[in-house]
A protein has these predicted regions:
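N-terminal basic, amphipathic alpha-helical segments
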Residues: 1-136, 338, 342-348, 378, ...
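Short beta-strand "wing" residues that participate in macromolecule-binding interfaces
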Residues: 67-68, 172, 428-429
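Active-site PLP attachment segment
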Residues: 70, 303-336, 351
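Conserved core of the PLP fold type I
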Residues: 140-278, 290-305, 468-469
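Structural signature of PLP-dependent enzymes
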Residues: 337-344, 360-384
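Conserved glycine-rich beta-strand-loop-beta hairpin in the small C-terminal domain of fold type I
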Residues: 374-384, 394-407
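Conserved PLP cofactor-binding pocket of PLP-dependent enzymes
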Residues: 397, 423-445
Length: 470
């Protein structure tokens, strides 16, 4: 029928649900077919009766099965008409490697147990204990759960953000902090305020695919600024400024996705000079600042928000489910962003913001961040060694943050390689997704927190051997 993997990150209940959904979707189990009894399935697959009960109940709730008293569980007729939200992921052959695919599949496809191409930390690296303690404290305090939040966000958290930024030499008050539903909403608000359809806009190349997709959706004309292992190609940037006269540059100077590179201090000063000379607004996406053990200066700390709009987030290190980000800007611009936030989606979630505030202030946050930084540094060393041992070229060795950018001379097409990897249950990050002008490339983004896994290297070694034998 199907096998269960007790070592998979997917819980056994989820594996059972997915297994039966697939059998029903491909007609291996036809409408009216009877499923194995609960005790029979539990005995044959080595799981508890309670696990099978929960899985069968989920399949009933989702419309795949029907339960008959004293008779058992049966495939429900018209189960193939189940809502799209619970549809079985498309076959491997149907996957399309572009930004839209990446945005959808990296989150939706639950059948890939290993995701070295993803952009978040593993569950056991996150601050879930802090979130649970915050939830319990909110319940114990009798926190009000109804009503809207404030337009700028929960005041106590805004004060905390301002105090945290002061430690990073960014001098702002709480009135200059706008809380958002993650950094994605912050970037979207800034883009919609600063850009019009047809406007040229500078972005890192390679860079953040979600941002590129969003900017294209707004009708902006994307111009890539080449990233190098040492930051930016400033000569190319100066030429692009002269040719296109853009007014906005969205960039991630620190621990950049996908390259992991960091902008040197000398480049930061030069970039600010160019921004001043060319009337350019710099939108600094600094969502990995908490992962930087050196706490290097940001553009915002050097500029004090004259030409820099600063975007941050707690989602990477608390939990992706805690969608709390923020944008910091000069007062007049921030007020306009707050108005735009209200027009487009009213307030952000006050409950989520209070939950984040509780997690950040319950006393263990700094210890958690140090643990994350240490684990990332260790993973960088091991993953870099494994990749270079297979013959991969590293774009750089940042030794911090989540990412390594690498390619192998015998694997020239990262998209084709990624297509093969899906068949082995592995989600890679093919380089063309991160390019302003997508084209075949051998570069791949590796999230070191997910790449310290023998299954990945067995797959890569096998693909290299196939190419060498061809």
């Amino acid at each position: 029928m199907f096998t269960l993997n007790p070592n998979s990150p997917m819980p056994l209940v989820g594996q059972i649900v997915d297994g039966f959904r697939r059998l029903i979707a491909d007609q291996s189990l036809k409408p009216g077919a009877k499923l194995p009894s609960i005790r029979g399935f539990a005995a044959s697959h080595g799981v508890s009766v309670f696990t099978v009960v929960e899985a069968y109940d989920r399949l009933v709730a989702q419309g795949w099965l029907t339960s008959r008293a004293n008779a058992g569980f049966f495939v429900k007729r018209r189960a193939t008409d189940a809502p799209a939200a619970i549809a079985v992921p498309r076959p491997v052959a149907d996957l399309r490697f572009n930004a839209q695919w990446y945005l959808k599949q990296i989150f939706e496809n639950r059948n890939l147990p290993l995701k070295p191409g993803c952009g978040w930390l593993p569950h056991d690296w996150l601050f879930e204990d802090g979130v649970r303690r915050s939830l319990r404290q909110m319940a114990a305090d009798g926190a009000e759960l109804g009503g809207y939040g404030l337009p700028h966000g929960h005041m106590a958290l805004r004060i905390l953000v301002a105090e945290s930024l002061a430690e990073h030499q960014i001098a702002v008050g709480a009135e200059q902090v706008l809380l958002t539903q993650g950094s994605s909403q912050a970037l979207d608000l800034v883009a919609r305020r600063l850009l019009k359809p047809g406007d040229p806009v500078l972005v890192d190349d390679p860079g953040y695919p979600n941002l590129m997709f969003m900017l294209r959706f707004l009708g902006a004309r994307l111009i890539g600024v080449p990233r190098t292992p040492a930051g930016y190609d400033l000569q190319a940037l100066e030429a692009l400024l002269a040719e296109h006269r853009p007014k906005v540059f969205f960039t991630q100077p620190r621990l950049q996705s996908p390259t992991g590179s960091v902008m040197p201090l000398a480049q930061a000063y030069r970039l600010l000079q160019l921004a001043e000379a060319n009337d350019l607004t710099l939108v600094e996406n600094d969502i990995c600042a908490d992962m930087d053990p050196e706490l290097r200066p940001s553009l915002a700390s050097l500029d004090q928000l004259r030409r820099v709009v600063y975007v941050g987030s707690f989602s990477k290190t608390i939990s992706p489910n805690i969608r709390v980000g923020y944008v910091v800007a000069r007062p007049d611009l921030l007020d306009e962003l707050a108005q735009l936030k209200m027009v487009s989606g009213l307030t952000s979630s006050d409950i989520t913001e209070r939950l984040a505030f509780g997690a950040l202030t319950e006393g263990r946050w700094r210890k958690h961040l140090k643990s994350v930084r240490d684990r990332l540094a260790d993973a960088h060393g091991r993953v870099a060694q494994r990749l270079t041992g297979l013959g991969f070229e590293l774009f750089g060795e940042p030794k911090a943050g989540m990412y390594l950018w690498a390619r192998h001379p015998d694997l020239p097409d990262g998209a084709e390689l990624s297509q093969q990897a899906v068949g082995d249950g592995i989600m890679l990050g093919p380089g063309q997704l991160f390019l302003v002008e997508p084209r075949p490339t051998g570069w791949l983004r590796f999230n070191v927190a997910f790449s310290d896994d023998e299954r990945l290297y067995r797959f890569l070694a096998a693909q290299i051997r196939l190419q060498e034998a061809a």
